[in-house]
Amino acid sequence: MIDFNQFPSPCYIMEEELLRKNLCLIKNVADRAGVEIILAFKSFAMWRSFPIFREYIDHSTASSVYEARLALEEFGSKAHTYSPAYTEQDFPEIMRCSSHITFNSMQQFERFYPMVVAEGSGISCGIRVNPEYSEVETELYNPCAPGTRFGITADLLPDVLPQGIEGFHCHCHCESSSYELERTLEHLEAKFSRCFPQIKWLNLGGGHLMTRKDYDTEHLITLLQGLKARHPHLRIILEPGSAFTWQTGVLTSEVVDIA
């Protein structure tokens, strides 16, 4: 039993044993499925815990210049970075801190890819794609809702990809099950698999809550193994956030006044 009186208030308290249990499960999924699973900072960025994470995973994903710096300077490896848009001011620092950079549009890719080439460190570039399918019920949070500007739809993607696009990024889940991922993959492959021979990696984004008690991890592993079998040249990446720290701690507080 934790003695909460020993901690300041308010305070986030993480239980290392519970964190390691989640990390072991995630590493087991990654190893058995033959994929890479990385940490999304937008969900969790308690940097003092990063040495524990590094025992189980190698990389993280960033959505801003500061998260990219956190990846390099505290997590100890360069980030897989995606942002809806980059600026001339931030992009040099983004490049310094990133091994992968995903662009939200062809316009962004065309604007910044020459800088990647000139920088010369071998950053792998990708483009976000929109499968026009998501089971997120709240439209405000649905990245594939009508009129969304997140990613490129299949009709706007050329049959021959521009030189320099090495990967696709697809994110349309939120605390989702493996069965939602299965249905998403059906749409993703139907719309974009014609381009898969031209790319090296496929990032399936976050929202895969594989540490939830009712999550079917065996189905997830089978699903990812099947995807790898159909496209053996592709490096498959998942970047969950909440799954890593699901039910691993609490926020303590105290009542200081009652009117």
Language model region names:
Residues 18:
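Active-site anion-handling motifs in enzyme catalytic cores
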Residues 7-9, 136, 145, 250-253:
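Residue-level signal for pocket-adjacent positions within structured domains
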Residues 23:
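Short amphipathic alpha-helical/adjacent loop interface patches that line ligand
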Residues 35-201, 223-226, 230:
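Active-site-proximal beta-alpha core segment in soluble small-molecule metabolic enzymes
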Residues 1-14:
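Generic N-terminal amphipathic, Lys/Arg-enriched alpha-helix
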Residues 176-259:
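C-terminal active-site-proximal or functional interface alpha/beta core segments in diverse enzymes
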